[in-house]
UniProtKB/Swiss-Prot annotation:
It comes from Chlamydia muridarum (strain MoPn / Nigg). The keyword Ion transport applies. It is a multi-pass membrane protein. GO terms for biological process: vacuolar acidification. Produces ATP from ADP in the presence of a proton gradient across the membrane. One of its GO terms (molecular function) is proton-transporting ATPase activity, rotational mechanism. Keywords: Cell membrane, Hydrogen ion transport, Ion transport, Membrane, Transmembrane, Transmembrane helix, Transport. It is found in: Cell membrane. This is V-type ATP synthase subunit I. GO terms for cellular component: plasma membrane; proton-transporting V-type ATPase, V0 domain; vacuolar proton-transporting V-type ATPase complex. Belongs to the V-ATPase 116 kDa subunit family.
Length: 649
């Protein structure tokens, strides 16, 4: 829920004691003059902590030391971490350069650079190395004196030249080789030994990670306290301070008690006209999960009702409908339970991880329920007479629709009988549903009526969910937007009238027993009544400008139709799952299992992407349009950061 926040003026003497007490209370956000910037100490500690955290990705758990080898101050620890990190980087770069140099001079063989220098000093003869392009079949030896062939490598011929020899620069290229491959390998071995020592030491410093984390928390607390104190205005030769701050209304009593104990005067003041009042949300249970989703897109304004619970429940329904597979839901459920057990220590100290796993578990349960209601399980075709199908929601509604068709004989019934004459003799809903036939271009016999009915039912459920979802949002916001009531009436009337206009049968006819002709006529008039109420509400609220409310009819229609994505995405996932199962049957069991695993893995990934993106989109775009202002900013009260120690790896 959203808790109101009021602006207060504080005047007192004991500035340090007051701000320290407010930090412990965590109910006041002080209006700072400048934006909070991390101090040099905070940046250094954060960088050092980041370096230690990255060790878990570079080294195995057995390499990291968890027992401290001695006492180190924070500054000593940071300096050693930075020095070691710099040295490791430098040595690693040197090893890469050495590796390239070894590769370059390897064809020259082993020689002593010291002996070459002595030879040059004693005789004055230089020793140089050259290479030329290797030509297959050409002689390797060179006719020039004091030019000796060494080796052929990398499609080049290598030579050593003693003394001054005139070689064609068009053919030969000199290669600098101050050290031989053997000398380079000795240096490489030395650097590798040094690198191992440095890495071993930095792994030992991992044991000090908790101390560094505590130091970071302490520095952050001190930094925020100083920043809050800097927001005050000193009066009467710095003997009195004044400060402005936002106070959580539900905790005003605690703030007043604190002020009385320190002799601080507080008075409520009005916010500036252009000032953004911060938003404070406080949720528990499912509402807390919804709050995490709400913060992804935008922050509610201070005038908004908290949409957290609404968003989560809607997302739960949308995600379940898009996944539309009980098998996938079982995988989500099992995975969340396994991770909750496997990472139970981390869950205790990570609120975000705890919320994610809880949400994943609930969504998995929703997918199981909706997949069971639509008889969808890993894309497997369920028999029309299976008990699993007979107790499903789609089967129940299909039976109701078949019963209505046989009783009322609407236009849709006549079209089906014309296309499938075998239906003419069917007297019971079950016989009518399960009658076998072939579709155009298809030679496989199947219950065509059953498939048509279930597809239409799922599509209409998606539209019905859209109407209900938008109506709830409009009613929730009707005090801020008077026309919302009219649009709710308009959508209800349109839902009753459109089946008559399209000469189709709707859920309201065979499930809710709304008379076909009468319901359509009532819906026709209710549609225009709702449109009139919407325009009237707009005029009452905005004057003559409210006449443009009539143009919103297109927006309302398009928003309702946007919910068809629930049906389209679920149908796409079901078709992919079914295709995977059909393909696997054409191969051997071993290959078939691989196809099933790969195909369903890809389908699950795509389904999750669609469920998350479109499940949230229907909330943030369609629903927010009628029930959300947004543009707010979260309240950040001054409070002490409590260091949560992580578990040992």
């Amino acid at each position: 829920m959203r808790i109101n926040v009021d602006k207060y003026l504080f005047i007192g003497r004991k500035k340090s004691e007051f701000f320290s007490a407010c930090r412990e209370l965590g109910a006041v956000e002080f209006l700072a003059k400048n934006k909070l910037k991390d101090s040099e100490n905070v940046r250094r500690i954060s960088e050092g902590l980041k370096t230690l955290n990255l060790l878990t990705n570079k080294y195995s758990p057995s390499d990291l030391v968890l027992v401290k080898s001695g006492y180190l101050t924070t500054e000593q620890l940071l300096q050693e971490i930075f020095d070691l990190n710099h040295e490791i980087t430098t040595i690693t770069d040197s090893l890469k350069a050495l590796s390239k140099e070894i590769f370059r001079v390897k064809p020259l063989g082993n020689f002593s650079s010291e002996e070459i220098r002595e030879l040059t000093l004693k005789t004055g003869l230089s020793v140089r190395f050259f290479y030329k392009k290797h030509i297959e079949g050409a002689p390797l030896e060179v006719e020039e004196e004091n030019v000796f062939y060494l080796a052929t490598a990398y499609n080049y011929d290598y030579y050593v030249v003693i003394g001054v020899v005139s070689l064609s620069k068009d053919i030969f290229t000199e290669i600098e080789a101050p050290r031989s491959v053997g000398e380079l390998r000795e240096e490489e071995e030395h650097l590798q030994t040094l690198l191992r020592k440095k890495k071993a030491r930095v792994c030992e410093l991992y044991a000090y990670r908790e101390e560094l984390l505590e130091a970071l928390c302490e520095q952050c607390n001190e930094q925020t306290l100083q920043h809050a104190e800097a927001s005050t205005e000193d009066l009467f030769d710095d003997k009195v301070f004044s400060a402005l701050g936002w106070v959580i209304v539900d905790r005003l009593t605690e703030v007043e008690k604190l002020c009385n104990s320190l002799g601080v005067y507080l008075e409520r003041v009005q916010p500036d006209p252009d000032e953004v009042i911060p938003t404070y949300l406080e949720n528990h249970g499912l509402g807390a999960l919804g709050e995490s989703l709400v913060n992804i897109y935008d922050t509610p304004a201070s005038t908004d009702k908290d949409p957290s619970l609404w968003v989560f429940l809607s997302f739960f329904v949308f995600f379940s409908m898009i996944i539309n597979d009980a098998g996938y839901g079982l995988i989500f459920l099992a995975t969340s339970l396994f991770l909750s057990f496997k990472a139970r220590k981390q869950v205790k100290h990570s609120l975000a991880l705890k919320r994610f796993l809880k949400m994943f578990m609930i969504l998995g349960g929703g997918c199981v329920c909706w997949g069971g209601a639509t008889t969808s399980f890993f894309g497997v075709s369920v028999s029309y007479t299976s008990p699993f199908r007979e107790y499903s929601l789609t089967h129940f509604l299909a039976m109701k629709k078949a019963e209505y068709y046989l009783k009322e004989r609407p236009k849709g019934y006549k079209e089906l009988v014309h296309d499938y004459p075998v239906l003419k003799d069917k007297k019971t809903p079950k016989e009518f549903l399960l009658a076998q036939g072939t579709s155009s271009g298809d030679s496989v016999y199947k219950a065509v009526v059953y498939d048509k009915f279930t597809d239409n039912i799922l599509m209409e459920i998606a539209l019905l969910v859209g109407v209900v979802h938008l109506s709830l949002g409009m009613l929730r916001y009707c005090r801020q937007r008077y026309s919302s009531i009219g649009w709710v009436v308009f959508m209800c009337g349109a839902y009753m009238y459109l089946p008559i206009y399209l000469q189709a049968v709707s859920l309201i006819h065979y499930a809710l027993h709304v008379p076909y002709e009468l319901g359509g006529q009532v819906g026709y008039y209710v549609t225009f009544i709702g449109l009139g109420i919407a325009v009237l509400g707009g005029i009452i609220q905005r004057g003559l400008r409210g006449l443009d409310e009539v143009t919103a009819v297109i927006q309302v229609f398009s928003d309702v139709l946007s919910y068809l994505r629930l049906y389209a995405l679920s149908l796409a996932g079901a078709m992919v799952g079914n295709t995977v199962m059909v393909m696997s049957e054409r191969f051997s069991p071993a290959v078939g299992v691989l196809i099933i695993i790969f195909g369903h893995t890809v389908n699950i990934a795509l389904s999750i992407m669609g469920g998350v993106i479109h499940g949230l989109r229907l909330n943030f775009i369609e629903w927010y349009h009628y029930s959300f202002d947004g543009g707010g900013r979260l309240l950040h009260p001054l409070k002490r950061v409590i260091c949560q120690k992580s578990q040992n790896i």
